[in-house]
From Swiss-Prot:
Keyword terms: DNA-directed RNA polymerase, Nucleotidyltransferase, Transcription, Transferase
GO molecular function, one term: ribonucleoside binding
UniProt-listed CDD domains: RNA_pol_B_RPB2 (cd00653)
Protein name listed in UniProt: DNA-directed RNA polymerase subunit beta
Annotated GO CC locations: DNA-directed RNA polymerase complex
Superkingdom of origin: Bacteria
Residue spans crossing the bilayer: none
Substrates-to-products reaction catalysed: RNA(n) + a ribonucleoside 5'-triphosphate = RNA(n+1) + diphosphate
Record family assignment: Belongs to the RNA polymerase beta chain family.
Organism phylogeny: Bacteria, Pseudomonadati, Pseudomonadota, Betaproteobacteria, Burkholderiales
Entry's Gene Ontology BP terms: DNA-templated transcription
Enzyme class (EC, first level): transferase
Alphabetized NCBIfam families for the sequence: PRK00405.1 (NF001616), rpoB (TIGR02013)
EC numbers, comma separated: 2.7.7.6
Length: 1370
């Protein structure tokens, strides 16, 4: 493979034994595809498919008036260009959205004649109507809602369709399995069928009161006869004068115990009474030609009649269907001359009489009576009129407006009831209901299997697009009602469509969904990995999903169908465990919303390169081998038996039977888990913590690539959108810290477009978690780029790879108890070198409002503040950028009018003399919070339309315009240079008819002449050839056009910046100040590795006291070795060994460079590193210069990749260690034979430790749980209103709770005075508190405890119960 520009700088040595068959897909594909399909903005209106917005409009329109003579039709919709781009929306606090305009027709009909009912079109009015704003997705797959970045999480919900299950014997004490079925539509009423312990079958609608299922069957038009015919086969009898004859059916007799002697037609006894009928008996009966068997009278009694029996003479019904035979009934039948009789066939084993028994409990007589019963159940208390009854029943399951199975539901339904085809009506039919009841009865009879609701074939994913569409539909449905009401008026009044449609309900529905839905979440932006994971999250919670409290263990557990679809490792700890999952690396969604995963096709034991994506249901049909199955050179499976999966179970099968094979060993895990090296050696619980904590790593000042990675780092960084990648290839024309200008290759430049790409980099931008988003260029001027190359690194990336921590030299050893219980000991050098220093950006906002007493003002003129306190504010009262501020410093001066107070005579006099004084305003300035300090890095001022801008606001606008003009000038410069190059090529050597500097007619134009003429005068040259003249003219026109378009763009930008800002109601001016806070590593900060090995920094030790090696190098971090064995995360030990090898190899390369070794020598050593084991790298693509520059990048350590489940073996680590540390070097460093341990020396005494210590490099992270954010202290502060006790929590500046158990402790010590103080003056004794304050001021230290306020609250509580309680003071 060819190396990209960025990869050439540093190649990661991979130990993967298998080449990738399938590249890791774009990780945000699911989100972006779903929303693109919802909007269909780049599809011509006529070509749009019926999904997303198009489907929502189609479902709501046409709207017809009540009398049917006015109709509103939908034609098409268009999306307007958003008014502000993403960055502008973020700074102004707006929503990045596009206006939807729908073209609708208002059609008014007329009657053809006064008598006829047929209609003719009277007039048609067409108009574009505003239909609310739809938020747009950014390039990174997120949304900007009110200025904050949010993510819509996909939802995993139960797929529509029909499901069969049983209660696992939990309902009834006998442990009997009660079967049930449920038809779940996408929209509409749920229909449940369930057996009760007496084996009667009931149904219920929307979990209401249950009713016998026969009522529903009658309501869909079945008679008792047809119900029985549908569920039972019949036994045919012939009535004799005494007894009867039964038709002989061998299958029904076999296995039964004879209740009487069974004889053949000759009268010979074949089966004696009380004997079991066997296959031999039935064969004998068949051979004797027996068609009927004589049965005694009592055999008939209790049998159930299958059809109505009618008296042939009178037409009277003697016996109704489902009636049991009795002696008197048989007598009646004989006397009426009835000979043939049909009874339903039932038995105890596999043909229960459930439907027959249910039918007997039901008293309704016909279809209408059944529907009335259903109406009464749905609408108790309402009178059942015929129209209302029929309308309700139609609306329940047969009306497309109220019931929608959806395409998925119909597909699942048909598959379940065994119908061919995946399509059909979206409402239920009578056959559907009957089919479900039949399957349920079969289940009770022991045929078939129940569904597993946790199977991913029964759970589907609802994506952003679908969720947004549902909201838009809701909004349209609300509009539909309002429009229907008003359509009648359109006949009389000349109304246009926009008079009828009010878009507010749509905007409200979308606003509520994007702003407040449980699935619309504040984006986790701590680092790039957190962003990507958040967008790939799949949640079972949310509207229409599960709730935490109701979700049982089964739903949360890992299911076999999660393989390759949902990660078995990454899920939160705590109440949401298993309910929130992460999509696996290669997983994608199919058209129905089910998760699919890719497999390679295997034919006759040979693995092909064909790849099929299988859903969970399809996968169950095949035998699938694992990705690590051994193959020979031709790609055939080796060995007689291959480890494979069949129907979810792991088995060994012969190679010929294998039909598919996994595409990659990492296929089963998510992005975060696939970034953990040696994941296969970690316990799953610790791997879960490791994956979760990687997302909490804070971006540090100088990101450093992980020495030991997995090879997914680059994909994750690029797909997260944190790094800047080249959209087109070209040459870097200009680079500075804020922008990169690329001149695009001619081949990739589009004709008529500017061949320049300008990448403006993000500088010190605040993320949602207050971390710092910052991009740094990694290209130089003149570099050649290809499309997709990384041109700038972002937060937590290093040369285009994710880098969330630092490589630290780790020693596993105890050190004076400072690493007890997972504490971490840190070398002071780490802090001094700022290895874990991070920048956090805080946004502080102040608003000047219009109050009743007058407008607040942002000003420098603040009462009672000294000049020193104001010295950093400019004349507008806003702090300068670059000022370093401490707690309590004024950032923005603001004064608020005070209420009128009664003035003393003296004040009145002063006022009369000096006019209005500052006493009528109070200082409400924005100050730095307690406990935070930092540097002001940016200020933004927003002013309401119509209010004079202050100087500072104007200055900010001017700076922004200057920056924008610079961009345009750069583009113009490159375009002009390109144009003049083309002109030079065009004119050189041509004949001219004349031109500047008295160019003679017929003279040849040469380079010397062109160099002597001002470039802009080249257009005045008159070439002799017409074609050349035309080309020159077209170049001139295109240049002028480009200039004109740039001027327009600048004008538009200026207009945007100078127009007033949209601010909340009553706000005149808003100032945002951004503070950058540097956080150094300190005791109390939480740190972790990638294997779930977390801990808290306990002490920062001077370099000279740390344990050191024989060559004097000291450990960066000392960890407790007891943290490894019990937690079973051995991956960290292997990572340490391999990291140690990487560092050693880097040092060897550094030594070679220092000794100025030849490039060929360095190349040979690199060949040994990269190509002696593991995956081979083609270093011949790099020339000598590139090899040396790559060697320079490798001096800090050679990066390794050990892919998940396909990583470096122990032997490979050993080989690398021996290559990195030859004998002489190992001795110099005091390493053991294995090179994995070293003898260390105590920094304080210089003595050698007795035993060798495991030492090496691990990628260690600083997590976003910083002691500075958690540390909090209070002396006095706010108190709760009712109880007068101090509030709790840092946010409320609260106190520490001295709870019940702490009181017990003081009681146990007998510390009476301390206890009294705790419960009174330090808590809620209001009088006592003030007295203590007074005594402290006076220098006395006496305490007078009074009555705690909470006692008074208790007394009041008791009184409210009507008990008169009083405190008697003695």
């Amino acid at each position: 493979m060819a190396y990209s520009y960025t990869e050439r700088k540093r190649i990661r040595k991979s130990f993967g034994s298998r080449d990738s068959v399938l590249e890791v897909p774009y990780l945000l594909q699911m989100q972006k595809d779903a929303y693109t399909a919802f909007l269909q903005s780049d599809v011509a209106p006529k070509k749009r498919t019926i999904e997303g917005l198009q489907a929502a409009f189609n479902s709501a329109f046409p709207i017809v008036s009540h009398n049917g003579f006015v109709e509103m039709k939908f034609v098409e919709y268009n999306l307007a260009k958003p008014a502000f781009d993403v960055r502008e929306c973020q700074t102004r606090g707006l929503t990045f959205a596009s206006a939807v305009r729908a073209k609708v027709q208002l059609i008014i009909y007329d009657r053809e004649s006064s008598t006829s009912q047929s209609k003719v079109v009277k007039e048609v009015k067409e108009q574009e109507v505003y239909m609310g704003e739809v938020p747009l997705m950014t390039e990174k797959g997120s949304f900007i809602i009110n200025g904050t970045e949010r993510v819509i999480v996909s939802q995993l919900h139960r797929s529509p369709g029909v499901f069969f299950e049983h209660d696992k014997g939990k309902t009834h004490s006998s442990g009997k399995l009660l079967f049930s079925a449920r038809i779940i539509p996408y929209r509409g009423s749920w229909l449940d069928f369930e057996f009760d312990p007496k084996d009667l079958l009931f149904f219920r609608v929307d979990r209401r009161r249950k009713m016998p299922v026969s009522i529903l069957l009658k309501a869909i038009g079945l008679t008792p006869e047809s119900i029985l015919a549908n569920f039972f086969v019949n036994d045919n009898f012939r009535l004799m004068d005494s007894g009867a004859q039964m038709e002989f059916v061998s299958e029904r007799l076999r296995g039964e115990v004879a209740r009487f002697d069974i004889t053949d037609k000759s009268g010979k006894v074949v089966v004696a009474k009380d004997k079991r009928v066997t296959a031999r008996h039935t064969r004998e009966l068949e051979q004797s030609g027996t068609k009927f068997i004589s049965v005694p009278e009592d055999f008939l009694i209790g049998r159930v009649v299958a059809k109505n029996i009618v008296d042939p003479d009178t037409g009277e019904i003697i016996a109704k269907a489902n009636e049991e035979l009795t002696e008197s009934l048989l007598k009646k039948l004989r006397s009426a001359g009835i000979q043939d009789l049909q009874c339903i066939y039932t038995n105890e084993l596999d043909q229960g009489a459930y439907i027959s028994q249910t039918l007997r409990t039901d008293e309704t007589v016909d279809e209408f009576a059944a529907r009335v019963a259903i109406y009464r159940m749905m609408r108790p208390g309402e009178p059942p009129t015929e129209d209302a009854v029929q309308a309700l029943f139609q609306r329940l399951f047969y009306n497309p407006d109220t019931y929608d199975l959806s395409r998925v539901g119909r597909m699942k339904f048909n598959a379940k009831v065994g119908r061919d085809g995946a399509t059909g009506p979206m409402v239920l039919s009578n056959e559907d209901i009957l089919a479900v009841v039949k399957i349920l009865v079969d289940l009770r009879n022991g045929k078939g299997e129940v569904d597993d609701i946790d199977h991913l074939g029964n759970r589907r994913v609802r994506c952003v697009g679908e969720l947004a569409e549902n909201q838009y539909r809701t909004g349209l449905a609300r509009i539909e009602k309002a429009v229907k009401e008003r359509l009648g008026q359109a006949e009389q009044e000349p109304l246009m469509p926009h008079d009828l449609i009010n878009s507010k309900p749509i905007s409200a529905a979308l606003k509520e969904f994007f702003g407040a839905s449980q699935l619309s979440q504040f984006m986790d932006q701590t680092n790039p990995l957190a962003e990507i994971t958040h967008k790939r999250r799949v949640s079972a919670l949310g509207p229409g999903g599960l709730t935490r409290e109701r979700a049982g263990f089964e739903v949360r557990d890992v299911h076999v169908t999660h393989y390759g679809r949902v990660c078995p490792i990454e899920t939160p700890e705590g109440p949401n465990i298993g309910l929130i999952n992460s999509l696996a690396l290669y997983a994608r969604l199919n058209e129905y919303g089910f998760i699919e995963t890719p497999y390679r096709r295997v034919a006759d034991g040979k693995v092909t390169m064909e790849i099929d994506y299988l859903s969970a249901i399809e996968e169950g049909k095949y035998i699938i081998a694992q990705a690590n199955a051994e193959l020979d050179a031709e790609g055939r499976l080796i060995g007689d038996l291959v480890s494979a999966r069949e129907k979810g179970d792991s088995t060994l099968v012969s190679a010929e039977r294998v039909q598919y094979m996994d595409v990659s060993p990492a296929q089963i895990v998510s992005v975060a888990a696939s970034l953990i090296p040696f994941l296969e050696h970690d316990d799953a619980n610790r791997a879960l913590m490791g994956a979760n904590m990687s997302r909490q790593a804070v971006p540090v000042l100088r990101p450093e690539k992980p020495m030991v990675g997995t090879g997914i780092e680059r994909v994750a960084a690029v797909d997260s959108g944190t790094v800047v990648t080249a959209t087109r290839g070209g040459i870097v024309d200009y680079v500075d810290a804020t922008r990169i200008v690329v001149r695009v290759n001619d081949a990739e430049a589009v004709a008529g477009e500017v061949g320049v790409d300008i990448y403006n980099l993000i500088k010190y931008q605040r993320s949602n978690q207050n971390t710092n988003i910052h991009q740094r260029p990694i290209v130089k001027r003149g570099d050649k780029l290809a499309k997709g190359d990384v041109v700038a690194d972002g937060a937590s990336t290093d040369l285009g790879e994710i880098a969330i921590g630092q490589n630290m030299l780790i020693a596993f050893m105890p050190w004076n108890g400072y690493n007890f219980e997972d504490s971490i000991l840190i070398n002071e050098r780490v802090v001094a070198e700022d290895r874990y220093t991070s920048i956090h950006i805080e946004e502080l906002v102040v608003m000047a409002r219009d109050t009743k007493l007058g407008a607040e003002e942002i000003t420098r003129d603040i009462p009672n503040l000294s000049e020193q306190q104001l010295n950093r504010l400019d004349e507008s009262g806003i702090i300068y950028v670059g000022a370093e501020v401490q707690p309590g410093d004024v950032l923005v001066g603001k004064v608020t009018p005070k209420g009128e107070t009664t003035l003393t005579p003296e004040e009145k006099l002063l006022r009369a003399i000096f006019g209005e004084k500052a006493s009528d305003v109070k200082d409400t300035s924005l100050r730095v919070d307690q406990g935070s300090q930092g540097t002001v890095i940016d200020v933004q001022v927003f002013t309401r339309e119509g209010i004079q801008r202050d100087k500072r606001a104007q200055q900010i606008i001017d700076d922004e315009l200057k920056r924008y003009r610079l961009d345009l000038n750069d583009q113009l410069r490159i375009v002009e240079a390109d144009a003049f190059d083309r002109i030079e090529k065009l004119l050189n050597g041509r004949v001219a008819n004349g031109g500047p500097q008295k160019l003679a007619k017929g003279a040849k134009i040469d380079k010397a002449y062109l160099d002597g003429v001002e470039k802009f005068h080249w257009f005045d040259i008159r070439p002799a050839e017409d074609e050349v003249a035309t080309q020159l003219e077209s170049i001139k026109n295109s240049l002028e056009q480009t200039r004109h378009s740039f001027d327009l763009a600048f004008e538009e930008k200026r207009k945007k910046l100078t127009q007033g800002d949209e601010l909340p109601a009553g706000v005149l001016k808003m100032v945002k100040v951004y503070l950058a806070v540097k956080r150094r590593l300190q005791p109390g900060d939480k740190m972790a590795g990638r294997h779930g090995n977390k801990g808290v920094v306990s002490k920062i030790v001077p370099v000279e006291d740390m344990p050191y090696m024989a060559d004097g190098s000291t450990a960066d971090i000392v960890l407790n070795p007891l943290g490894v064995p019990s937690r079973m995360n051995i991956g960290q030990v292997l990572e340490v060994h391999l990291g140690w090898a990487g560092k050693g190899l880097g040092q060897r390369i550094g030594d070679m460079l220092q000794q100025e070794a030849r490039a060929a020598e360095i190349r040979t050593f690199m060949e040994e590193i990269y190509n002696s084991r593991g995956r081979k790298e083609d270093l011949t693509q790099l020339d000598d210069k590139e090899i040396v520059s790559m060697a320079q990048a490798l001096t800090t350590g050679v990066p390794f990749a050990t892919p998940v489940f396909d990583g470096a073996s122990e032997q490979e680590i050993q080989d690398m260690l021996h290559l990195a540390y030859p004998e002489e070097l190992a001795q110099r460093k005091g390493l053991t034979e294995s090179r994995t341990q070293a003898y260390l020396y105590d920094g304080r005494t210089g003595d050698r430790f007795e035993r060798p210590t495991t030492i090496g490099y691990m990628h260690y992270l600083k997590l976003h749980h910083l002691v500075d954010d958690k540390m909090h202290a209070r002396s006095t502060g706010p108190y709760s209103l009712v109880t007068q006790q101090p509030l709790g929590g840092k946010a409320q500046f609260g106190g520490q709770r001295f709870g019940e158990m702490e009181v017990w402790a003081l009681e146990a010590y007998g510390a009476a005075y301390v206890l009294q103080e705790m419960l009174t003056v330090k808590s809620d004794d209001v009088v006592g508190r003030t007295k203590v304050y007074e005594s402290i001021v006076k220098g006395e230290h006496a305490i007078e405890a009074g009555m705690p306020e909470s006692f008074n609250v208790l007394v009041k509580e008791i009184r409210s119960l009507g008990l008169d309680i009083e405190l008697e003071r003695s």
